[in-house]
């Protein structure tokens, strides 16, 4: 109810703006997920259909110095009540001056350069019910001040209002086993979700290199999942600890080579670790005398916890191919394989996109999981190989 009232209030504020000064765009998508095996938990559904909408409103004045943006999102899912959800991705006011910028409200901030995972991207919470690749994020309340100088840009954040990570429900698929029970969520801070987090980032372009140094203090976006009893069932209970995280991201462009690195040091009272992802992408331009480009992607994924890591990517290699046709339909595809160095566990993923006409877009995603080792985090998805087909209308 609270979220519905907030969405309604935001909508009323937006429609009160002069119609001629507001620009609208957005998309409506239909999505089908096809699973190739019976679920590991008989309560989980099989193939699944859903519909989603994400309109976007933008209004600026004072010669573009001030602006307001509003991006709500909603999905109606056939099988998982937790995936049927709504969120305000963005509802913010921005003020742009010569040497500084303000953003106040609900917004999204992206940090990161690597392909396989984004370790430094900590401002927004992951909307995990949308996709297990952790690319989709929830809107985060914030006040952001950007100081623009010759020696770089400094972004300062005050982050009130913590967002809990979304997880698939009892019928949801793919999901971990045992499932996560959000009603059992606990916090290290006595303020729980009201703890005010702080963050800062310095970024700069130095020749062919883009570099970012970041710091975060507050409630971890990644919960510790502890076994617990819930209505006679073994589940996982999320625990959100207070952390300090320092991070670095670097991208170096040299001709056809693109070198990338992300690394973090996370310090908490309950869990401490170091993680890093680094590698390169080499692009073959105009393959076979065509307009198409083919990129070779290789990355190494490291976690100091080793086999004790709660992520499947603690000592793994990513090998991938990125095909970009550079045609009128903006056709592209990315095939990737993440392989564990200690056993035969791996994850294969495929993403492909193609525009149809001026307003339609077809997207295909496929994932295959193989867990022959001791990695329980990947074994949870062993029966959840799937093909996802999505058709979107963009206006």
Task: Tell where the protein language model's regions lie, with residue ranges.
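Repeated loop/turn-to-beta-strand initiation elements of outer-membrane beta-barrel proteins
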Residues: 63-68, 99-102, 151-154, 208-211, ...
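Residues that define the transmembrane beta-barrel architecture of outer-membrane proteins
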Residues: 45-51, 84-89, 137-141, 148, ...
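Outer-membrane beta-barrel "beta-signal"
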Residues: 145, 280, 381-395
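Residue-level signature of outer-membrane beta-barrel architecture
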Residues: 22, 57-61, 94-97, 106, ...
């Amino acid at each position: 109810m609270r979220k519905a009232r907030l969405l309604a209030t935001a909508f009323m504020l937006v429609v009160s703006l002069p119609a001629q000064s507001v620009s609208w765009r957005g998309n409506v998508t239909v999505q089908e997920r096809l699973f190739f095996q019976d679920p590991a938990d008989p309560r989980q559904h099989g193939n699944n259909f859903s519909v989603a909408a994400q309109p976007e409103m933008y209004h600026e004045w004072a010669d573009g110095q001030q602006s307001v943006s509003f991006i709500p999102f909603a999905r109606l899912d056939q099988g998982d009540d937790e995936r049927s959800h709504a969120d305000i991705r963005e509802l913010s006011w921005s003020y742009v001056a010569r040497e500084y910028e303000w953003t106040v409200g609900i917004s999204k901030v992206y940090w990161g350069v690597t392909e396989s995972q984004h370790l430094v991207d900590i401002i927004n919470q992951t909307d995990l019910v949308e996709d297990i690749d952790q690319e989709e994020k929830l809107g985060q309340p914030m006040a952001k001040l950007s100081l623009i100088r010759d020696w770089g840009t400094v972004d300062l954040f005050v982050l009130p209002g913590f967002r809990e990570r979304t997880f698939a429900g009892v019928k949801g698929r793919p999901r971990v086993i045992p499932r996560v029970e959000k009603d059992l969520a606990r916090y290290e801070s006595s303020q729980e979700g009201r703890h005010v987090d702080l963050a800062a980032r310095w970024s700069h372009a130095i020749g062919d290199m883009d570099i970012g140094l970041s710091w975060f203090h507050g409630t971890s976006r990644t919960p510790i999942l502890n076994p617990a009893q819930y209505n006679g069932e073994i589940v996982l209970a999320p625990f959100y600890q207070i952390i300090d995280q320092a991070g670095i991201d670097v991208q170096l462009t040299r001709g056809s080579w693109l070198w990338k690195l992300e690394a973090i040091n996370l310090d908490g009272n309950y869990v401490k670790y170091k993680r890093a992802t680094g590698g390169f992408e080499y692009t073959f331009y105009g393959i076979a005398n065509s307009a198409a480009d083919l990129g070779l992607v290789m990355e190494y994924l490291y976690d100091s916890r080793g086999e004790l890591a709660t992520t499947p990517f603690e000592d793994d290699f990513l090998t991938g191919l990125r095909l970009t046709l550079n045609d009128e339909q903006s056709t592209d595809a990315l095939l990737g394989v993440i392989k564990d160095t200690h056993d035969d566990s791996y994850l294969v993923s495929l993403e492909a996109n193609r525009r149809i006409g001026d307003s339609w877009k077809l997207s295909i995603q496929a994932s295959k999981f193989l867990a022959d080792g001791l990695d329980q985090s990947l074994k949870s998805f062993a029966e959840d190989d799937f093909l996802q087909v999505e058709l979107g209308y963009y206006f």
